[in-house]
Amino acid sequence: MGQELSQHELYVEQLKKALKTRGVKVKGNDLLKFFDFVKDTCPWFPQEGTIDIKRWRRVGDCFQDYYNTFGPEKIPVTAFSYWNLIKDLIDKKEADPQVMAAVTQTEKILKVSSQTDLRDNSHNKDMDLISLESDDEEAKAPSEKMTMSNKSPKKYPAMLASQNNNTDKDPDLSEVDWDGLEDEAAKYHNPDWPPFLSRPPPYNRTAATAPAVMAVVNPKEELKEKISQLEEQIKLEELHQSLIIRLQKLKTGNERVTSSGNIESHSRTPKWPGQCLPKGKYLINKNTEEYPPKDIFPVTETMDGQGQAWRHHNGFDFTVIKELKTAVSQYGATAPYTLAIVESIADNWLTPTDWNTLVRAVLSGGDHLIWKSEFFENCRDTAKRNQQAGNGWDFDMLTGSGNYANTDAQMQYDPGLFAQIQAAATNAWRKLPVKGDPGASLTGVKQGPDEPFADFVHRLITTAGRIFGNAEAGVDYVKQLAYENANPACQAAIRPYRKKTDLTGYIRLCSDIGPSYQQGLAMAAAFSGQTVKDLLNNKNKDRGGCFKCGKKGHFAKDCRDHSNKNPESKVPGLCPRCKRGKHWANECKSKTDSQGNPLPPHQGNRDEGPAPGPEASLWGSQLCSSQQQQSISKLNRASPGSAGLDLCSTTHTVLTPEMGPQTLATGVYGPLPPNTFGLILGRGSTTVKGLQIYPGVIDNDYTGEFKIMARAISSIITIPQGERIAQLVLLPLLRTAHKIQHPYRGDKNFGSSDIFWVQPITHQKPSLVLWLDGKAFTGLIDTGADVTIIKQEDWPSHWPTTETLTNLRGIGQSNNPRQSSKYLTWKDKENNSGLIKPFVIPNLPVNLWGRDLLSQMKIMMCSPNDIVTAQMLAQGYSPGKGLGKREDGILQPIPNSGQLDRKGFGNF
């Protein structure tokens, strides 16, 4: 054997070198396959022992006949290429010594092999031209070789060694369907079947034997033998599968056994009620052409011929993760559609690691942590119940931790344990919080410009069903969205019948609206100079006729009919009111009629115009719209018994709460009647509507304009011109014996409040006490410093600092100063807080609070201006004199020190 191997290796090596001289590089593996094909198609070639151009052309003719008979699928793609290359070598073997040596070596091997006993050849007629068996396999006992030689061809699965071969009669070759028989045999080839008791010899390419000499056999007899083997194999496989099914039925207690011809899945039935076992690899029925579905679940279990269970673990199919991820993103983690997907996945055996991988892939980081905490809590409760039951399923097994963190260990769980893991995982999923608006995705479903309305409604109903669980639950909401999210053409068709029909009526109304209809609308809108939406909204409106000519199509201002330009004026008849003259009744000025009876006052609007209705104003009737100066005698009362005179605004004003008190002009000027003074008060209706009127006193000798102090309480207030917002109450003025030596008030505005808010500026430096991480620091407020600086002496030694590459420049300079390694929390007396990273500099006389801290505190710097000074002077303030009417008030301003007994800003 060793000598044959050496000769064969020498032959292959010489052949490769010979081809290399021709500029062709080939692999030894490809040459082995080529000679295998030569042996299959030309079994006579190895037995003749001679290689010449004549015999090699006969090999080429066999290749061509095989190609014409079985087609290109049955012949290797490189067969003709290698045949041509070797043909060129044989033609030039006399000129090339290397080629001559290769041909001589091949003929020598063939002649030695041709002397082999024909009886031995009959046992090896299925062997390759170049044997690939190892030395160990050739040393096997003759009985084992006999068993191996009786196996089916290598392209079909091997049969069990324990099964006996049936010796049926050879069928008639003329009645055999060769293609159908080969397809039927190929269906039973499944690489995932469990291992058999005996395996075919290994394909050892590194220890190949010399080519075995084949005996001359009749091709017809060889085909008959192959047919009988295939039929025997099919029958045994059918019997094998039927026995497995019957065995499973007996194990589960179901006495109803299916027929042996019905090939079903051989997955093991779950042991626990309600637990659906994941389906493993499927077998193909001989009467169907469908292939098994792809196994997408991690843990599957199959049974071999001896009833032994085999478990397999596969990764998740990407389509499952993608579908679940899409449902979570569009409808939410707790939507009915999403839960249905989770429950369908949970019906299979998922290990704790599989659950964690699935949840981490489809949920956000926060939701994953929530699910994990709920899952662990459910597992703790289940583990306690298991401990009481004494079944040994602890917390580590349920969560896949500790000794069970390995996937191989989790695969061996009992089906009941898989059921507990499923319940804990799905219950944890249902406790995820609802985020966002569940109906947001539903409102986003809109009809396209060319999309049929029925397709749009179908998408809307499908999305609603996935969100609400049942589309009937939100049918009213879907109907509303079907109208609002439809395109303008469908909206125009539905609008007249919107409240008269249901969703099916909408579909019937819009059934004829398509792309051609949309195109016609676009053209009509372009010709009319309108948008499509405006065209649809206005097409059903009946435009009235012209007020002058009565014709439709234009307004009175555009009318060109001048026939009624100077119509004849009618002459009034006898006045129906006084019956004294010929005039119109609304122009009658008589106090009595023709009989001398007094006439009632005129009814109607007269010269004042129409009476103001409730929509004319938000506040009341417009009683004063003139901006001219009016005296108090022109003011009106709301009713004969009203105590106050109405004051109205002369301008359109908008007030906001941020504006504070504002003065509103009334257009009414003094003086008041003798021996009276006025009190300005707000109306009750204005206060209810959010407008606050400040009370004010009008002096008897005041001749200026009466103004109202008003403020918006909590919202924006609009005061139209002429609105009644306040009332003036006249009260008697009591004289006292005390004489006032002061000129009359005249037209001066509001008096002084005797209060002047200032911020005193002293020679002391503005300092501030702050707490950094609980330690008090006193520093100087430095608005010119960019950063906060703490002197080295005040810095705690255990607080870490880091050297920086920054240069601090001011009056002095510090190169590479040190800075706090972490952010410190600052806090003031009023519990305001923030974060800063101050610099630390040695030999600094005082701490400096820079703008990085002052900006967080929102400190503002203010200074007096000319406007404030003018306001003070207008209120009667005389520099150098006291405040007040008598100028006997305080001479120095009152500093604003703030409230010391409570936190926050303010003075009241």
Curated annotation (Swiss-Prot):
One of its GO terms (cellular component) is viral nucleocapsid. Residues 215-251 form a coiled coil. It is an enzyme of class 3 (hydrolase). A motif (PPXY motif) lies at residues 200-203. A zinc finger (CCHC-type) spans 544-561. Residues 864-908 form the G-patch domain. The active site is at 782 (protease). Its EC number is 3.6.1.23, 3.4.23.-. CDD domains: HIV_retropepsin_like, trimeric_dUTPase. GO terms for biological process: nucleotide metabolic process; proteolysis; viral translational frameshifting. One of its GO terms (molecular function) is DNA binding. InterPro entries: Aspartic_peptidase_AS (IPR001969), B_retro_matrix (IPR003322), B_retro_matrix_sf (IPR038124), dUTPase-like (IPR029054), dUTPase-like_sf (IPR036157), dUTPase_trimeric (IPR033704), G_patch_dom (IPR000467), Gag_p24_C (IPR045345). Keywords: Aspartyl protease, Capsid protein, Coiled coil, DNA-binding, Hydrolase, Lipoprotein, Magnesium, Metal-binding, Myristate, Nucleotide metabolism, Protease, Repeat, Viral matrix protein, Viral nucleoprotein, Virion, Zinc, Zinc-finger. Residues 777-853 form the Peptidase A2 domain. Gag polyprotein: Late-budding domains (L domains) are short sequence motifs essential for viral particle release. They can occur individually or in close proximity within structural proteins. They interacts with sorting cellular proteins of the multivesicular body (MVB) pathway. Most of these proteins are class E vacuolar protein sorting factors belonging to ESCRT-I, ESCRT-II or ESCRT-III complexes. Phosphorylated protein pp24 and phosphorylated protein pp18 contains one L domain: a PPXY motif which binds to the WW domains of the ubiquitin ligase NEDD4. Nucleocapsid protein p14: Nucleocapsid protein. This is Gag-Pro polyprotein.
